[in-house]
Amino acid sequence: MAVRGINKVILVGRLGKDPEVRYIPNGGAVANLQVATSESWRDKQTGEMREQTEWHRVVLFGKLAEVAGECLRKGAQVYIEGQLRTRSWEDNGITRYVTEILVKTTGTMQMLVRAAGAQTQPEEGQQFSGQPQPEPQAEAGTKKGGAKTKGRGRKAAQPEPQPQPPEGDDYGFSDDIPF
C-alpha cells in the first residue's frame, strides 16, 4: 500500500471535562476527550488582549483510553499525537459530520500539567504510547551444541545505568563567546 500523504495532528491543550470512557463489545476501551487550545493576540485597533479558543474532539483507543480515564481530569494539560478523521452519520434524514483526532496504537498521549485538585495521577510529563512496551528479554545460557544450562538460564532483568550529566552547569562549554 502506497502512502500518498501524511495525516498527523499534534495538540497541546487542556481538558474541558473529565474523559468519558466506555467499552465496546470486543472489550476494548474507548475514551473521548474535549481538548481546548487557545491563541491570544493584541488587537491593533483597541490595544486589548484577545483570545480565541478552539475545541478539539480526541478519541483514544485501548490502553491509552484506560490510562486517560484513570489519570486525566478536567483542567489537565496534555500533549496529543494522532490522526485527523471525519466521520458522518444520518440523523432524522440529515447527514451529520464530525471531525476528530484519533489516537490509536501509533499515537501518543502525554500529561504535561496536572489539573488543580487532582489526586491519583502519574508524575507530570509521563508519556503514554499506544504501542506496547517491549518486555525485557530473558537471557538463556547455552552450552556448546545449544543445550540450555541448569536453571533454564533466566536472569533477572537489570535496569540499565542512565548517563549522568557533567558536573557543574557548564556542560563542557566555556563561558567565552566565540565572536
UniProtKB/Swiss-Prot annotation:
A Gene Ontology biological process term: DNA replication
- List, alphabetically, the Gene3D superfamilies matched: Nucleic acid-binding proteins
UniProt domain SSB: residue ranges: 6-110
Does the keyword field hold RNA-binding? no
Q: Which residues bind DNA?
A: 55-61
List the biased-composition ranges (Acidic residues). Answer: 167-179
User: What segments bear the compositional bias annotation Basic residues?
Assistant: 145-155
Biased composition of type Polar residues is found at: 118-132
What does it do? May contribute to the conjugative processing of DNA. It has a functional relationship with Psi (plasmid-mediated sos inhibition) proteins.
Name this polypeptide is given: Plasmid-derived single-stranded DNA-binding protein
**Source organism of this protein record:** Escherichia coli (strain K12)
